[in-house]
Amino acid sequence: MWYVMQVRTGTEENIRCQCQRTIDRRILERCFIPYYQQKKRFQGQWHIQERILFPGYVFLIAENLEPLMENLKHVIGMTRIIGTEETIVPLTDQEVNLLIRMGGDKEQLVRLSQGIIQGDQVHIISGPLQGMEGAIRKIDRHKRIAVLSLDMFGRTVDMKVGLEIIEKNKDRNTEACLQET
C-alpha cells in the first residue's frame, strides 16, 4: 500500500533520508519524493531543473501499517499520515496509477511535456501530460509550467508540472498542425 506523510515544506529530503536510515526494509519497502522537470533560463542558457511535485509530502510504500506507524514515531519532523480523522487511508489504485503513469514506477520523475496551443485549446504532443489536457487548469508559458487540478489525498489538489509550449496558433485548425508533428 502507498501512504503519504505530511512534513514541513523544505524538510522532505531530510525526512526521506531519516526514514530510509531508521526503518527496517522489511517494514518500509520504499520511501520517495516525486519530482518534476521544469525548464529555466539563467546565465543566458536553458537548464532543466527538478522540483518537488508535492511540496510538504513524502510517499511511503509498506504492506503493514501498524509496524510502520510504530517506527514513524521515531522520525523527527513528521507531521502526520494522510487519512481521515479516525483512520489512515492509503492512496487509491487510481492515485497510484496516476503517479506511476506520470513519473514511472521507480524514478518518480515527471518529465517535461511539450504542447501546442490552437485557439483556446492546448494539445500535448509529447510527455506524460498526453491525454490529460482536461486536467490542465492553467498554463504559465513564461515559467514553462502547467497547473493541473487533480483529486489526490482525498481532496482536489493543484499540481505543477513542466510544460513547454512549442507553438501557439490563433486559428482553430488543429488538424493541420497536429498532422505535421
Model-inferred region functions:
Residues 127-129, 139-144:
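Short, conserved beta-turn/loop elements at beta-strand boundaries and strand-helix junctions
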